[in-house]
């Protein structure tokens, strides 16, 4: 969706007074919900965000430090609007090229190297969060290539710009204020660099996720998801634990599907309220034993009683997988089948 850009009307003294009164009565998302964003009104919108931050208990020192000199970043909006929207075609792109790019030899090797470096902490992290370390490493590898690509955008500027632009105003306004709360908690301002969309650190958390999830895994008093391996892996582990990861269950296993298999007979009839196009590519839930009775055989270590769904990312006759509920936890982190499959396959390779 695009937003038509227009100039805001001149801010007269009367409007300024009304703006100040409105800021105390309603959140920025409602006050500006019907406005078209242009750089001219950014400073006025920042006054609203500052008022909301004060109302949520953010210190004046932090508000001033984080908003003084903040400017609208047109590049952020350009990048946001260039993101692919809903496809008009019925055939998704092939998975194989994505897999080759994201489960490559270099990423596998780097993941194994980090695994070796944190081997002494692996047991403690896995015991606390119930998630295999290779899965946590694969998320880290998928998000930032183990910290090599964390992003260099100023987070305050990016989040404020996205909030002001307006298509997802409430989401980004809340994330901007969460960023200020991070500073109030002691996160140094110079750490606040990341993606244009506001994600940061090794696991690419949003500010609200950092406040809710980030862990001080090494016990030094600071949840450092920028430079601490243990804090990074512990924080991803906490996310997966809270999202419902089931210990002792794989994310999925490869499967063989017989020729002439009746795929229509096992097609899902559910309409997921979250990421419907992602979930539509999966089958009905059946136990591994029930799949075997239909001729679909699991090719990995998984219990016969485990409920799974079938996915063939490149269509019939191509690689197939039986996916457990833990796969849905990976989707909770990033709702893309190609992302989730690649995380699972990368984890398998790291663990070899």
Predicted features, each with a name:
Residues 12-26:
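Bacterial N-terminal signal peptides
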Residues 1-8:
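N-terminal secretory signal peptides that target proteins for export/translocation
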Residues 34-126:
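An acidic, Gly/Ser/Thr/Pro-rich helix-cap/linker signature
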Residues 217-225:
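Acidic, glycine-anchored loop motifs typical of Ca2+
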Residues 258-352:
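C-terminal soluble interaction/assembly domains
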């Amino acid at each position: 969706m695009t937003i038509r850009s227009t100039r805001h009307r001149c801010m007269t003294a009367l409007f300024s007074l009304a703006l100040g009164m409105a800021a105390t009565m309603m959140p920025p998302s409602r006050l500006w919900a019907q406005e078209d964003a242009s750089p001219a009104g950014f400073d006025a919108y920042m006054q609203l965000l500052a008022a909301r931050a004060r109302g949520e208990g953010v210190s004046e020192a932090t508000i001033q430090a984080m908003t003084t000199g903040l400017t609208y970043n047109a590049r952020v909006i350009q990048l946001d609007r260039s993101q692919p929207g809903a496809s008009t075609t019925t055939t998704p792109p092939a998975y194989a090229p994505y897999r080759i790019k994201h489960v490559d030899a270099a990423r596998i090797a780097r993941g194994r190297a980090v695994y070796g470096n944190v081997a002494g902490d692996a047991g403690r992290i896995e015991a606390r969060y119930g998630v295999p370390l290779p899965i946590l490493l694969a998320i880290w590898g998928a998000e930032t290539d183990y910290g090599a690509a964390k992003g260099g955008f100023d987070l305050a500027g990016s989040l404020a710009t996205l909030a002001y632009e307006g298509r997802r105003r409430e989401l980004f306004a809340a994330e901007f204020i969460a960023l200020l709360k991070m500073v109030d908690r002691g996160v140094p301002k110079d750490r606040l660099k990341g993606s244009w969309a506001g994600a940061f650190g090794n696991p690419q958390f949003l500010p609200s996720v950092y406040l809710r999830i980030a862990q001080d895994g090494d016990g030094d008093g600071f949840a450092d998801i920028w430079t601490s391996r243990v804090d990074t892996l512990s924080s991803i582990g906490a996310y997966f634990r809270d999202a419902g990861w089931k210990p002792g269950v794989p994310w999925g296993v490869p499967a063989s599907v017989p020729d002439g298999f009746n795929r229509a007979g096992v097609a899902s009839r559910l309409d997921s309220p979250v990421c419907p196009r992602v979930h539509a590519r999966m089958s009905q839930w059946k136990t591994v034993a029930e799949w075997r009775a239909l001729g679909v055989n699991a090719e990995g270590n998984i219990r016969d009683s485990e409920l799974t769904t079938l996915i063939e990312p490149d269509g019939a006759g191509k690689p197939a997988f039986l996916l457990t509920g833990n796969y849905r936890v990976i989707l909770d982190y990033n709702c893309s089948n190609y992302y989730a499959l690649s995380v699972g396959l990368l984890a398998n390779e790291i663990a070899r």
